[in-house]
A protein has these predicted regions:
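Active-site-adjacent capping/gating segments
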Residues: 1-7, 177-178, 270-272
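Active-site Gly/Thr loop motif
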Residues: 164-185, 249
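N-terminal helix-loop segment corresponding to the beta1-alpha1 unit
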Residues: 1-138, 170
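A short glycine-threonine-serine/GTX helix/turn-capping micro-motif
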Residues: 107-117, 139-141, 172-175, 179-181, ...
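Beta-strand segments within the central parallel beta-sheet cores of soluble alpha/beta enzyme folds
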Residues: 139-147, 254
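Short Gly/Pro-enriched turn/cap motifs at secondary-structure boundaries
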Residues: 6, 168-176, 198, 230
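Aromatic-enriched alpha-helical interface/lid elements that frame and gate functional surfaces
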Residues: 180-262, 269
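Oxidoreductase and adenylate-handling cofactor-binding alpha/beta cores
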Residues: 119-139, 152, 156-164, 208-215
Length: 272
């Protein structure tokens, strides 16, 4: 019986199993390669080469083959022989360092940015290689490391590092220095009864109308974006007092209809 993980990722796909440690398995594999456009592999570093099935061997069988490889840390560098999994890629790619709250440890991100993110980057590389093959008829070896994929997905934090000259701290749910720009509790106070509100400066007046406090536009504490940042604890408390009296979907509708970006924090059951 196939695992749930296997069926989730391989629905509507045909598959077969080959033992590549046997002569028959290698022979059948090479027959498939001869008729294939793309080979995707994520074996441990050097595994296919040790079996005699590396790129240099297979391109002699099929010169148009796109040989696509995923490795934890790529072919070169001090960690090229090291194995990797999702959390390792997140740790080494910088994602964990900017995830979590300032007073807590680096935090693992549950959406699989290391696994799925690397696969998406590789798919783009494969498509580019196929496009080039239309011109010269030749395949190529395309490689993406899990660390590199996570680094690319952390590009905003890397940009901010370059601008500030130091590593970016963890900010919890606060997005940059925009206030309001975080999660707020909602009624009835369940585990996921929260909304995320991101009211940009041009939306400030509309936001105040929604929460019924237009007079805050005249409050010096909140008159500018910089002032709102300096007084964010006071403003967040005001917003939370309003959201906590309302269902998260009610808050989302009210904000959305006023042109203020807002999302209800849905659990997996609500998403499905």
């Amino acid at each position: 019986v196939d695992s749930l993980y296997f069926t989730m990722l391989n629905a509507n796909k045909r598959s077969l199993t080959l033992n590549l440690k046997t002569d028959d398995g290698k022979r059948l594999f090479k027959q498939l390669v001869a008729e294939s456009d793309v080979l995707v592999e994520n074996f441990s570093p050097g595994a296919l080469d040790r079996m005699g099935l590396g790129y240099d061997t297979l391109k002699e069988i099929n010169s148009g083959l796109i040989y696509a490889t995923i490795k934890g840390f790529g072919t070169f560098g001090p960690y090229s022989e090291f194995k990797s999994f999702e959390p390792i890629a997140q740790a080494m790619g910088g994602a964990m360092s900017v995830t979590g709250f300032p007073d807590g440890p680096p935090t693992y991100v549950w959406p699989s940015i290391g696994d799925s993110g690397t696969g998406m980057h590789l798919a783009i590389g494969i498509l580019a290689a196929l496009q080039q093959r239309h011109g010269d008829g030749l395949g190529q070896h395309v490689e993406v490391s899990m660390q590199d994929a996570v680094v690319n997905l952390c590009r905003v934090s890397l940009r901010d590092h370059q601008r500030a000259g130091h590593a970016m701290p963890r900010q919890g749910n606060q997005l940059g220095r925009n206030v309001p720009g975080t999660t707020y509790p909602c009624h009835p106070g369940g585990t996921n009864d929260y909304v995320y509100i991101f009211a940009q400066p041009q939306m400030w007046s509309a936001f105040l109308e929604v929460i019924g406090l237009p007079e805050l536009a005249e409050d010096d504490r909140f008159a500018t974006l910089e002032a709102r940042w300096d007084n964010r604890e006071a403003l967040d408390a005001i917003v939370a007092a309003w959201t906590s009296q309302r269902d998260k979907h009610e808050v989302m509708r009210a904000m959305g209809e006023a042109g203020v970006p807002c999302g209800a924090c849905q659990d997996t059951g609500e998403v499905l």
